[in-house]
């Protein structure tokens, strides 16, 4: 009940973020329901249905990440003193955020279920003519219990991810707010680069001859056969970019502070170094997804006879929207965390234009470093497949 009351009294922007989480959960739930419909309509094609279900893990992970990012920026999670005075400790705050995330995702998957049943014609009306019957399993009984159990994985995954990310951390220096030591610089940059390089090498080795056999990377709307080594290489490269994200953001800050920086460069660089842990992972995921999307477009441009399917478009839209929204939410969280520092700078005489120019310089530095790296990884990933 407390989660519902807080949702009713939330700011419109907070409600908008939760609505976006519900829409992401609805898109992921619709993809999962389509796998159930395909399995019901093609009982003999179990391998194909299983592959379609495995492809749903990408939007499921993106939805969970977006749900965690939204829970981090929830005002109730940041007002710890007031909540503690009201009798809600750190553990109960985590439970409250988990319940709110679960309710939001449950709302989304219920909407997906209603839309799916309406398109199939199971709610007392004709089935949708514009949709392929194979995607919905029209004319075949839908196992409702199995569909509900599969849909339950969306709010369950988001709830577990939120509980793990927002769990109370008891540290020795919790009482020291101002005299706490600095956070150590990220150490995952060399490991991330090594993983990305290893993934590209695995893909180059295992993709020999796949072009001649038509074994390009399949997506769940059209193609089924898939070279496992190519998928493993892509996955390893993706994890490498995600792991290297905090180190890359910290490197951007170091580059801005290199030489004899002025006040603007020094301020921008220090902020990037301090916020590398908070911004690095969402930006790393965004770079990985952007690299994979660019590589997939390049691969399928080389094979025009294999167009993207409807499920591929829905899944790609969910993943891209979630990772972009997660990166923007992380930037908003970083801005909220620096509220005291910004207020101190304003009291010292820093104008608003200086702060805006510092933010623009940080964004420009991130684009200059991350965009070429993302493009390079995508190009190297597609070279063995299109040549």
Could you describe each region identified by the protein language model?
Residues 1-28, 44-46, 57-70, 183-387:
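Hydrophobic multi-pass inner-membrane translocation pores used for secretion
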Residues 20-38, 53-76, 80-84, 90-207:
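Transmembrane-helix bundle segments that line or gate the permeation/cavity pathway
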Residues 36-46:
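Short, hydrophobic transmembrane alpha-helix segments
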